[in-house]
Amino acid sequence: MAEVAENVVETFEEPAAPMEAEVAETILETNVVSTTELPEIKLFGRWSCDDVTVNDISLQDYISVKEKFARYLPHSAGRYAAKRFRKAQCPIVERLTCSLMMKGRNNGKKLMACRIVKHSFEIIHLLTGENPLQILVSAIINSGPREDSTRIGRAGTVRRQAVDVSPLRRVNQAIWLLCTGAREAAFRNIKTIAECLADELINAAKGSSNSYAIKKKDELERVAKSNR
C-alpha cells in the first residue's frame, strides 16, 4: 500500500513542475509589459509635468508638480484635508481649483472650477505657446510675499512688526491673491472668468504690475519694510 501511495504522489507531483514554470514565466512577462508600457499621466490629457521646474529653492517642497503628483484631473476627494499641513503635498493645480470655489454661490461646484482651469490653461497655451503648468508655477513664485507685518503688544500699546513669511504661507497667499484677482476682474465684465484667470496668471508669471496679485504682494512688502 505504501508503494502505491508513493506512485500516486509521484504522478501528481511530476506534472506540477512545468505548470509552475509556465505560470512564473507569464507573471514575469506581464510585469515586464506593465513596467515598460506605462502611459504618461497628463493633466486634462494634454499637459505634461515632466519639464516643469520650480526655480525658487524654498518653495520646491510646497509646489507639488512632479511625476509623483501627476493627475489626469485636479480632484482627490479631500484626501489632503484630513490632517494639518498635508495640503502642502496636494497637487498645485488642485489647490488652484479649490480656491476658485470661493464666495457662497460657488461652494462645492468643483466641476465648474475644473472647467474654468481647463479653459484658462488652453488660453494660456494659445497666448504664450508654453506649458500652462510652468506659467502657473512661475506666477505662484512671483505672487507670494516674502515679508509681512504682524501686530505685537497688548490692548494699550500695539505696534506692527515686520516678519518673514513661511514657504507654505507664501504659496497659500499667492493662490488666494491670484484667484481673487481673477474673480474681481471677471465681475461685471464681458470677459469670462477663464479669460481673466489666464490674464492674471500670465501677468503674474511675467512679474507685471497689471496683475492684481503682484500689486498686493508689493503693497504688503512695502508696509512690512516700513515697520522693520
Swiss-Prot record:
Pfam families named in the record: Ribosomal_S7
Keywords per UniProt: Ribonucleoprotein, Ribosomal protein
GO molecular function, one term: structural constituent of ribosome
SUPFAM superfamilies: Ribosomal protein S7
Disulphide bridges: none
One GO BP annotation of this record: ribosomal small subunit assembly
GO cellular component, one term: cytoplasm
NCBIfam families: PRK04027.1 (NF003106), uS7_euk_arch (TIGR01028)
Family to which this protein belongs: Belongs to the universal ribosomal protein uS7 family.
Record protein name field: Small ribosomal subunit protein uS7A
Organism of provenance: Drosophila melanogaster (Fruit fly)
